[in-house]
Curated annotation (Swiss-Prot):
Family, similarity comment: Belongs to the UPF0310 family.
One Pfam family hit: EVE
Gene3D superfamilies: ph1033 like domains
Protein's organism: Mycolicibacterium gilvum (strain PYR-GCK)
HAMAP family linked: UPF0310 (MF_00771)
This protein's name: UPF0310 protein Mflv_0785
CDD domains associated with the record: EVE-like
Upper lineage: Bacteria, Bacillati, Actinomycetota, Actinomycetes, Mycobacteriales
Length: 141
């Protein structure tokens, strides 16, 4: 299994949680194709809304990929994003700042936001555990 962070505004995360899906990189399929059933995805939201929301800087959802391949949906004639189905877990929105020193994927703590510019990226099991614990995710429920 691989662990991922997907950088998405909170309003888009909430839409995905309601619909049980994720998109990445403005609907492009590339990173979604790298994911496999059972992979963990943590959602980080720099803002409350896209594109002009208030700063948030929090982990806003967590779940596991629930299908085998990306699929395309038609939103409008010229916007047909790719998606993956996700089984979301109950969690609490968690600010990132108290976790920065504990997260290995943030190599330069003074420029902690840099990594999120990549949109979707892998994290190790340690970082997943730190985030999952902070989000009060109970895997036994």
């Amino acid at each position: 299994m691989t662990n991922w962070i997907n950088t998405v505004s909170r309003d888009h995360v909430e839409r995905g949680v309601r619909g049980r899906f994720t998109q990445a990189n403005h609907g492009k399929p590339h990173m979604l194709r790298k994911m496999a059933r059972g992979d963990w995805i943590v959602f980080y939201s720099p803002k409350t809304e896209h594109p002009n929301g208030a700063p948030l800087q929090a982990f806003t959802a967590i779940g596991q990929v629930a299908d085998d391949e990306p699929y395309q949906v038609e939103i409008t004639g010229d916007f047909q994003p790719w998606r993956r189905n996700v089984d979301f877990l109950e969690s609490v929105e968690t600010p990132i700042r108290p976790l920065i020193d504990s997260l290995d994927f943030i190599e330069d703590k003074s420029r902690w936001g840099y990594k999120f510019r990549f949109g979707v990226f892998r994290i190790d099991d340690h970082d997943l555990d730190v985030i999952r614990s902070a989000m009060a995710v109970d895997l036994c429920a």
